[in-house]
């Protein structure tokens, strides 16, 4: 993170001493118990998707909290791990919208410019949202603000009420917002299914003269 192009711009959006506070927090929680993702994957979203490559942002809430699932990219799991319910529904909507993606691992999206950002970057094992206590949100809000400042158009995909609250941070009119209910089984049938976010995103990117995302890769 220290050497990425993100660092200085994110730092400008944060209070003095915030990075030291985050470092102290991580030292403490990783020493106390099982935390996901592995520490070297905490900043995976911004490490995998350089700022100048960002074309799409998909905002999640916090990492998966089961063994071997979280890899620092929202909604993504390694291929050897079964897809959790929300990811199953994302892949089902993708199949209906564009075509079948075989992989559960969304790293290929991240490498194409899809920033897979969780609002909280860590979670204790089997304790969903336990770190949604304000420690991470200044950081992830700063990431969104930095992307908002880009002079090239970006698609923000906001699934569910939590992600939709981030719309207040997206003030640059060149960007495009796609919103729907969350892909969770609790809400997917209330408007996520049939929303076609993937083809919508590509139509916008192509209209702006940008390369579309190969969502099936």
Swiss-Prot record:
Xref: InterPro entries: UDG_fam1, Ura-DNA_Glyclase_AS, Uracil-DNA_glycosylase-like, Uracil-DNA_glycosylase-like_sf
Pfam families in UniProt: UDG
Any one Gene Ontology cellular component term annotated for this protein: cytoplasm
Family of this protein: Belongs to the uracil-DNA glycosylase (UDG) superfamily. UNG family.
Gene: ung
PANTHER family documented for this protein: URACIL-DNA GLYCOSYLASE (PTHR11264:SF0)
EC number: 3.2.2.27
Protein name according to UniProt: Uracil-DNA glycosylase
Molecular function GO labels: uracil DNA N-glycosylase activity
SMART domains, per the entry: UDG, UreE_C
Coiled coil region boundaries: none
Swiss-Prot/TrEMBL catalytic activity: Hydrolyzes single-stranded DNA or mismatched double-stranded DNA and polynucleotides, releasing free uracil
GO biological process assignments: base-excision repair, AP site formation via deaminated base removal
Summary of the function given for this chain in its UniProt record: Excises uracil residues from the DNA which can arise as a result of misincorporation of dUMP residues by DNA polymerase or due to deamination of cytosine.
Compartment annotation: Cytoplasm
Keywords assigned: Cytoplasm, DNA damage, DNA repair, Hydrolase
Lineage: Bacteria, Bacillati, Bacillota, Bacilli, Lactobacillales
Recorded superkingdom: Bacteria
Active site positions, chain numbering: 62 (proton acceptor)
């Amino acid at each position: 993170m220290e050497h990425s192009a993100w660092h200085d711009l994110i730092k400008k959006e944060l209070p003095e001493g915030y990075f030291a506070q985050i470092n102290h927090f991580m030292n403490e929680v990783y020493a106390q118990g099982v935390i996901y993702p592995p520490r070297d994957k905490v900043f995976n979203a911004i490490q995998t998707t350089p700022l100048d490559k960002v074309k799409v942002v998909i905002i999640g809430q916090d990492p998966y909290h089961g063994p071997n699932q979280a890899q620092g990219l929202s909604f993504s799991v390694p291929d050897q791990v079964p897809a959790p319910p929300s990811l199953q529904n994302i892949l089902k909507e993708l199949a209906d919208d564009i075509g079948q993606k075989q992989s559960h691992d969304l790293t290929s999206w991240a490498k194409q410019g899809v920033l897979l950002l969780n609002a909280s970057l860590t979670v204790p094992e089997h304790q969903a949202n336990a770190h949604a206590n304000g420690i991470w949100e200044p950081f992830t809000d700063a990431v969104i603000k930095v992307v908002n400042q880009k002079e090239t158009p970006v698609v923000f995909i906001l699934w569910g009420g939590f992600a939709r609250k981030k719309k207040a941070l997206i003030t640059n009119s060149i960007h495009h917002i796609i919103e729907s209910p969350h892909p969770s089984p609790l809400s997917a049938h209330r408007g996520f299914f049939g929303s076609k976010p993937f083809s919508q995103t590509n139509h916008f990117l192509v209209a702006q003269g940008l390369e579309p995302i190969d969502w099936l890769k």
